């Protein structure tokens, strides 16, 4: 965008989409979408999430600012506030990636989405970026929730509890297996 366009307010800046992460994909696996510390879902400070209303899954404390697709699939739902995305995998698992607790109240500030509903995505493709500092400054928790919302129809097992730990919580890297869906 040129100098005059900036002054005149013409056009919106084009978002800079991060490079895709490389995931070694396996069938029936949901992968870590952002480098994280794993937290038991029942320890999340939100009744809806901690009681499993969004389905079986994991709560993760983000150590990055880009959320990558945790599985191959089709984007079924995006939020106008850009804080959550729903993906249906080829085998029918409905995966919700939800950034932050009550961050819907931020009205999209601090979030940038790179995909739209109806798009096919691959594991490792950038879905959205977020500003964790801005989330905290706004008084919210930046915990990322990854859940299988139709877990009442299929088995979901947490597989990412081994490895390096910080304060007793597993340290996970983008692309490592997080959940198995059967």
Give residue spans per PLM region.
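Contiguous, well-folded functional domains in the mature portion of proteins
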Residues: 2-182
């Amino acid at each position: 965008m040129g100098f005059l366009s900036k002054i005149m307010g013409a056009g919106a800046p084009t978002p800079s989409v991060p490079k895709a992460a490389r995931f070694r994909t396996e069938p029936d696996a949901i992968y870590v979408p952002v480098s994280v510390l794993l937290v038991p879902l029942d320890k999340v400070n939100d009744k809806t999430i901690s009681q499993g209303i969004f389905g079986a899954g994991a709560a993760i404390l983000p150590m990055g600012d880009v959320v990558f697709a945790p599985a191959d699939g089709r984007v079924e739902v995006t939020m106008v506030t850009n804080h959550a995305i729903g993906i249906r995998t080829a085998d029918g698992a409905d995966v919700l990636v939800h950034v932050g607790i009550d961050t819907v109240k931020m009205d999209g500030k601090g979030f940038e989405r790179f995909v739209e509903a109806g798009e096919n995505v691959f594991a490792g493709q950038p879905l959205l970026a977020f500003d964790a500092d801005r989330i905290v400054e706004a008084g919210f928790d930046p915990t990322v929730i990854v859940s299988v919302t139709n877990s009442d129809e299929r088995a979901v097992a947490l597989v990412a509890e081994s490895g390096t730990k910080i304060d007793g919580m597993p340290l996970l890297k983008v692309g490592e297996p997080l959940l198995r869906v059967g």
